[in-house]
Amino acid sequence: MDWLKNTTIVVLFSHSTDKSNKHKKRQVQCNMRKNTLDMVTIGIACLVGVYTGTRFFEPIVIDRLRKDGNLRTDIPIPEYDEDGNLLKVTPSLSSTPAAPPTPPTPPTPPQQ
């Protein structure tokens, strides 16, 4: 008779979890939506942060490269005023594109 009581308890317990499983499914779906929204929000915030960070540090980096003598001269470099505002992009004479290299001529086959 003891095994019957235990079986009944198990059946009643498993029956009561069916209702809670539906609730848990809804809760998991809600958590997944919340997690997805959080990840998208963090991604957008990171993109905005990187964009504004590069816009902020670009004049500082260009100035430092110019002082060190490591600034490339083959590309146009934007000019900034003392406040870091973009003045004008002026292409320098050395930034004119060079002629593309000519392809090597194929070797002539030996005549027989």
Curated annotation (Swiss-Prot):
UniProt keyword list: Cell wall biogenesis/degradation, Membrane, Mitochondrion, Transmembrane, Transmembrane helix
Chain residue ranges for the region called Disordered: 82-112
Membrane-spanning parts: 35-57
Compositionally skewed regions (Pro residues) per UniProt: 98-112
Superkingdom in the source lineage: Eukaryota
GO cellular component, one term: mitochondrion
UniProt-annotated location(s): Mitochondrion membrane
Main location: mitochondrion
Membrane topology note: Single-pass membrane protein
GO biological process, one term: cell wall organization
Further details from the record: Present with 1890 molecules/cell in log phase SD medium.
Function: May be involved in cell wall organization and biogenesis.
Name of the protein described by the UniProt record: Protein ECM19
Organism: Saccharomyces cerevisiae (strain ATCC 204508 / S288c) (Baker's yeast)
Taxonomic lineage from the root: Eukaryota, Fungi, Dikarya, Ascomycota, Saccharomycotina
Gene name, Swiss-Prot/TrEMBL: ECM19
